[in-house]
Amino acid sequence: MLSIFQKKYFLVDLLEGFTDFHNHLLPGIDDGANSAEDSIAMIKKFNEFGVTNFVASPHVMGEFYPNTPETIFPALEKVKKNLPHGNSIKAAGEYMMDQYLIDQLEKNNVLNVAENCVLVEMSYFQAPINLAEILFKIQNTNLKPILAHPERYAFYHDSSFDKYKDLKTRGCDFQLNMLSLTPHYGTGIQKKAFQLLERGMIDFISSDAHRMEHLEKIGNIKLKKKQLNLLEPIIEKSKALFK
């Protein structure tokens, strides 16, 4: 899928052996796949990119999606029943940093996205007032927070990058959304994504795919050689997270 004439490269050509650990493949428990049939169709699309390993990460937020292992694992089993041969799928969560997360941490009820790592997110309107406390509680349970799509939090879009640096100082790794490499979420978010990449602040990348439309767009992402060079080590580090 190399585009010789445009001197650009398809992102998906780098994904062989990649584990997609931020997606909404599990049916009926958040704003992702509606049915197991939708889940399997999305997995087959991923397979076209060379991706056969998944950690499903449904939203976990007290107000809208109060998921627990008791709701997540039955949804996982629905997918496993018809999982195409050669694929593997596990379940975790994308945890809103709210009181519900604190409660789940205290109950030892949090599903890790990788060994000792928990995928977290914030509201798109503002950071939680008790952000420092939540990050401390996460790490106090011997978990490493991976912040989903930091490029999408507009309240951090100042020129100094100090707020991002503070999160790094507090122990957060950053996970970039693939679609943030395009104007899908807006040109401001696309710009911030590349700025974070250029500053070496991104640790991992994943799809955050909610539906087939997202995967079709990911399949069409083309990169310049300079952009490719920025992303290659991020993709390799993402692969290494699951070795």
Positions of PLM-derived features:
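Short acidic/histidine-rich active-site segments
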Residues: 202-217
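Extended substrate/RNA-proximal surfaces in nucleic-acid metabolism proteins
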Residues: 2, 66-173
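Mid-to-C-terminal alpha-helical segments outside catalytic/metal-binding sites
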Residues: 4, 219-243
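Non-catalytic positions within long, well-ordered alpha-helices that form the structural scaffold/packing
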Residues: 47, 139, 197-198
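An N-terminally biased module of ancient metal coordination in phosphate/nucleic-acid-related enzymes
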Residues: 1-86
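Hydrophobic faces of well-ordered beta-strands that scaffold small-molecule active sites
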Residues: 19-23, 54-56, 89-93, 118-120, ...
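Mobile, glycine- and charge-enriched loop segments
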Residues: 8-28, 160-178, 182, 234-241
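Active-site beta-loop-alpha junctions enriched in small/polar residues
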Residues: 24-26, 59-60, 92-98, 123-125, ...
